Amino acid sequence: MCNTEQQKEKIAEWIFQAIREYYMKKCTFPNDKLHHPELAGKPMAVGGDPEARHGIVLTANYIAKRAGVKTGMALWQARQVCPEIIFVPPRMDLYLRFSRMAQEIYSEYTDQREPFGIDESWLDVTASTSIKGDGMKIAKEISSRIKYELGVTVSIGVSWNKIFAKLGSDYKKPDAITEFSKDNYKDIVWKLPVGDLLM
């Protein structure tokens, strides 16, 4: 087979990452846990001012979510369903700093990066696979580096398209890597609600 045909048949390797310790949509709890270690193991949410009784839950950790706290819920409602919840204010400067540091790591694997908010990105690592290995190998290396260098964990999805890569990052969390390949996606994805495709 000639090189041109090989290139045509090459499957793109997309990686979607999301910086997470607890369930994350906005790069918050990994960093807040680092700066509030005394709150580990307690129900937490990032939100507005609970004393003034205004604001909403921007994100909540797994402990709070198990108690019924949901993203977008008013703070007073979150307190009703989880009386022991602890609210911490958002720290955008901190989240942006972590986001920049993560992007610096990703830049060593590809220049084809598409940020999706401050805590998530699509990485097209197709051009890097001949040097650094397949998508799963690259994902494992990125996961290890983020954990070691930044002190937080990531959930990563690996697939040949962006939607399945994003779905993979949400499928298992926290600190997990999920691959949806052309061999396994029907067995897993077709059983999921269609709303899960872009959570």
Sequence positions of predicted segments:
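Gly/Gly-Pro- and Ser/Thr-rich, intrinsically disordered tail segments characteristic of DNA damage-repair
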Residues: 1-199
